[in-house]
Amino acid sequence: MRVVKKKLLRIFTSEDESFEGKPFYKYLLERAKERGLEGATVFRAIAGYGKTKEIRKHKLFQLRSSLPVVVEIIDEEEKIKRFLEEIKGKHNGLITLEDVEVIYL
């Protein structure tokens, strides 16, 4: 077993946020892969709220969804910081960065 210190980047967005004609979470996932970042996962929330305090949740028969989405990316600090520089100005939502230990079995 090997334990390595990495950074976990979390970007909070929503299903309806877009950039360059595609959902913002897809843009982030594609950029992370292109830049060779170690791993990225997209989570769709059941419900949530942000700075507007408007609770967003799934509604039956709703044509457009605006559920919260979280993109998590893990890699070394320098690669994460470069990625953050690249997406600067493209998102005005919450972004968090924390230390994690990745365990390779």
UniProtKB/Swiss-Prot annotation:
Q: Which Gene3D superfamilies match?
A: 3.30.70.120
* Sequence intervals crossing the membrane: none
List the residue ranges forming a coiled coil, or say none.
none
Q: What's the domain of life for this entry?
A: Bacteria
SUPFAM superfamilies registered for this protein in UniProt: GlnB-like
Q: Give the family from UniProt.
A: Belongs to the UPF0166 family.
Protein name per Swiss-Prot or TrEMBL: UPF0166 protein aq_450
